């Protein structure tokens, strides 16, 4: 697959749907050494101590729950090696073939027993929506939705005695950027011609839930939503001269984004890490799934100071602070 197609098929949502459609009754995912270097197992596994969440229908039925899958689990690299001991292909052979795209299926000998307990609780969480009416009588009925997610992880497993996951960059900073944009657009004498919606969406960290609900059931007529601009975790660790418009190549917004960047003297840089599948991991994807043109404007990677490597700073943030208690306001901004 190309990067975008791979991102789609790599999403947990799509994997579960495909497995259920093909008759699976359970699924075990395995880690791999390449991802372990970027996101250590100990970091990722902390998230599994937190409850999963699903949207529910009006009658309380869970959305996208795939009841055919009775149990799922994920194993570390070492766990995968133990599971595949004696199999036709070892874990390390699978890891090697993963890098070359030459994986083949085989029957796994043995019996796996999974057990667990589930407690269900209904939780209400709200999106917050503000509206700036358009100034053009012919276009004011069209709406552009600016989004940023208002949630983070909250209280979780302690790291060095700290169990508060603050989410300063992910995504308090994104919310701040959206609110600042709303403030400036409202004060601008040249009022926007189309109506603007500023939507702080909930439960992004639980699977784009707030954005999915808004994109499916917006507060305005759905066919009046003409575009979405999303801001999520802008890693502004140094002054940059560019932005990264993720998903622009799949959107009719490309010419508009290019024109706006040209007016501001800002460069546009392709996604520097397409292997991270960010295209399907943030709120703009909920709008894409509903056929609404959307783009995720991420922080750039070209530092104004030629002695600073902005991409290295971004990579270090992902490795050391992403979804960690250390994502705090004392990081340089």
Kindly give the residue locations of the regions a language model identified:
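Acidic/histidine-rich catalytic neighborhood of metal-dependent amide-processing enzymes
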Residues: 8-18, 35, 154, 160-252
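Short, solvent-exposed loop/turn and secondary-structure capping segments
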Residues: 2-4, 31, 37-44, 86, ...
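Soluble metallo-hydrolase cores and metallopeptidase-like ectodomains found primarily
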Residues: 61-167, 183-187
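Extracellular/luminal Protease-associated
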Residues: 1-64, 68, 133, 141, ...
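Metal-dependent peptidase/peptidase-like ectodomains
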Residues: 54-91, 201-306, 312, 318
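Active-site-proximal beta-strand/loop segments in catalytic clefts of secreted hydrolases
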Residues: 1, 30-33, 75-78, 117, ...
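His/Asp/Glu-rich mid-to-C-terminal helical/loop segments that flank catalytic regions of hydrolases
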Residues: 183, 187, 298-333
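Second-shell loop/turn segments in exported
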Residues: 1-16, 65-73, 80, 115-119, ...
